[in-house]
Design a protein with these regions (language model features):
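Class I S-adenosyl-L-methionine
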Residues: 1-24, 29-123, 223-224, 229, ...
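A contiguous loop/helix-start segment that scaffolds small-molecule binding in enzyme catalytic cores
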Residues: 2-14, 88-92, 148, 156-272
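Class I SAM-dependent methyltransferase SAM-binding "motif I" and its flanking Rossmann-like core
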Residues: 3, 12, 23, 99-171, ...
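Short hydrophobic alpha-helical segments that form membrane-spanning helices or hydrophobic packing faces
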Residues: 27-29, 131-134, 187-188
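Residues at the C-termini of beta-strands that transition into short coil/loop
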Residues: 45, 65, 124-126, 155, ...
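Alpha-helix capping/helix-boundary segments
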Residues: 47-48, 101, 128, 183, ...
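Phosphate- and divalent-cation-binding pockets in alpha/beta enzyme and binding domains
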Residues: 50-51, 104, 130-131, 186-187
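Short hydrophobic/aromatic-enriched beta-strand-loop microsegments
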Residues: 59-66, 119-121, 140-150, 195-204
Length: 272
């Protein structure tokens, strides 16, 4: 990376950096520059190994990640560590998978810094929904199809039942569900309850952008079984299927697209 532009140093105590979904190719130049200037990097578990490999050897690395439905660092511990490290005068990078402002509990960490009168800046990253859609050759919005995009999380069930399920169930709507594997059957039931058809298009993308990325083309009818077969972090795109005509998905080899067993209408009849 010797041809990269020079990066100006910054006086802020903490830089929040979105690392993208996994591949180092999706890291922004600003994010790369922040990593090179850091004294301490506090990172999540969802940060890809390719990105972690870009952290200089002399930089102190602290793993304080969260794992869905598994062992996780307490948010209070993360906040306290941020404040403690930044208070020493070290240049701290808080490295989060995807975009740090989407389901990353960014505000809680900022509030902890503000309470300690510590400065910060935010460097956004590519979020999984954007990269996943690109990897299946689709756009998240399309003129004449959907005038809005919903981004929801299936991890915290508090308030999840109160989502706009009727709106999501409408033909042509697109919703990106983060951390939705374990709530797949609930999602299916709610959408069908509000009028979504069993053959509604669904794509599940596991380990987005990584070497072991897996794309599963499904329907609403097969969503729970498709989700149950995945073992890694995944995003669910409701209302979209992989675009295959003319090899539009340049990155995807045929072996990496799987079709979930159909229990309703054939895949080619699914609504996109």
């Amino acid at each position: 990376m010797s041809n990269l532009p020079a990066f100006a140093s910054t006086a802020v105590a903490v830089t929040f950096v979105g690392a993208g979904p996994g591949a180092a190719a999706h890291l922004t130049l600003a994010a790369y520059g922040a990593l090179q200037q850091a004294d301490v990097v506090i990172h999540d578990r969802l940060v890809g190994p390719e990105v972690l490999a870009l952290i200089p050897a002399h930089v102190v690395r602290i793993d304080l990640g969260k794992q869905g439905f598994g062992p996780s660092a307490l948010q209070t511990t993360i906040n306290a560590t941020l404040v403690a490290q930044a208070s020493t005068g070290a240049r701290v990078v808080r490295l989060k998978g995807g975009d740090c402002g989407i389901f990353g509990r960014l505000d809680e960490e900022i509030e902890a810094l503000e309470a300690a009168q510590l400065s910060f800046r935010i460097l956004p990253g590519l979020t999984s929904a954007a990269v996943a859609a690109a990897n299946i050759g689709q756009s998240l919005t399309r003129r004449g199809r959907n005038a809005a995009l919903r981004i929801v999380t299936g991890h915290d069930m508090v308030g999840f039942a109160d989502q706009d399920w009727r709106g999501m169930a409408q033909p042509g709507e697109v919703t990106a569900v983060y951390m939705g594997k374990k709530s797949a059957r609930f999602i299916q039931g709610r959408l069908m309850m509000h009028g979504a058809l069993p053959d509604t298009a669904v794509t599940l993308i596991e380990n987005v952008s990584r070497a072991d990325e897996r794309i599963v083309a499904a329907t609403l009818a097969t969503l729970p079984d498709a989700a149950a077969a995945l073992t890694g972090p995944a995003i669910i795109l409701l209302g979209l299927l992989p675009r295959r005509a003319g090899h539009a998905v340049a990155k995807i080899k045929a072996t990496r697209i799987q079709e979930a067993p159909l229990q309703a209408a054939p895949l080619q009849e699914a609504r996109t």
